[in-house]
């Protein structure tokens, strides 16, 4: 069945053709809203309407498009999509007619972030019915308008990543991060071997890693700044707009910023995190361009000899989302064997979190599945958030915990923040009480008492949440809202935020230091190397005199990459070209009169200033 929408006479192929002026459209039901539900309000310049396809391979017909006698060689369209996989096929005369071109839509960042993208077409003249058909669309792709070109355009090209398996005996450089001595902002020491004991086998830590920082256009809204400017009437952005709860230490970045990805990988590996768990739980959207950029960067780091966490996917708790994502990820990743070294394995198969109860055996047998949702525990569950004392998931026996969760905070709507303790969120939270991270400490202490195989930590880098209009009586920050007040669910401000990634506000790296502390208590830590007596070093003699000096301190090499990346919402370009000293090895020696310092640089370029604090260990 075809649905007539509007009748056209002749359409000039070289003028702007509004996508909503189609003459017919395929009859696929979208979101249960009816067969003609292809239109929505467009936030592109000029407003109006746009058409969209939501995972349904929709097509639109434009009748009597006149290409004239001077042939068209190109196609240009105003599109929005964040999947990086949707194709828009250009077909002549019937839906089964010749395909004259395919626009491979490159992610624009968000569903209403618009870009003009182009592709060449088979030279075309005369009058034709034109069909535009979306294919391979794992998310939501939208079209505002299009036109044809007399010239061959520069084709919009998706990023591609090369891959060759690492050697079977590959081992990364061991910098012994579990032996590093550290003190946090509160003056509390991070656990070492004396407190944590020796390393324990079969203990793993995963952390939720989010993929929401995608926007190339728009405004940056930061609730911490807005509340500071006007606490009682903050100037929030438009409804359903992402707001940061605070500013990341790396500025307002996008998930494809490789400078940030590299530092995330080092921070997490050094803290003892084994696996980053990509949050693809949102209605089956794969966020492909973003996790692909992250995974490829992790692979590049391993090629350079650097250790990194591995990865897995969280596909939500709905069967529809898990079914779509399992099929998509199998086809585009796991069946190819690509990045196999980075797959996090559980019971001999790649771990996937999701609801596999209605999944075909073809995919169910490829992965080890565990259900994973907030406040849920029990058989074959990997909970990601719970109230203290947290429940746990089990596999072999209900008496043997397999996995439990630890969260930094919960939700602004449930009024459970960083200071939540004993079932109560304090009425008057200060920076000092927030910085104590009471909820985080209590959750870790209970998780340690359970002693499972796996601890799922929430979270690393969510950073944003959308603002919504409240219904009468909506809970938010411990009070009832009036209708149409604004509220936020997951993230709101420093107290109600779950991100362990360091911020540039008063929280700094406190949560990160506590993460490292408790992971050592869970997994154990190697002993710090002991100093082996005094050594007198002559500056005029060979470096070989340092060979017997212990301990040695090692740094990751190749980690002084520069930065030049578009910021979130395109508000600026983030540039950092300060990388110089690529430290390799450091040692300290002493005798009765002097201290001696040895610094080896990977790139033979050193500018060093020493600020020495001598203390008794």
Predicted regions and their residues:
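Extracytoplasmic
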Residues: 8-161, 605-607
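Surface-exposed, glycine/proline- and aromatic-rich loop segments on solvent-exposed faces
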Residues: 537-617
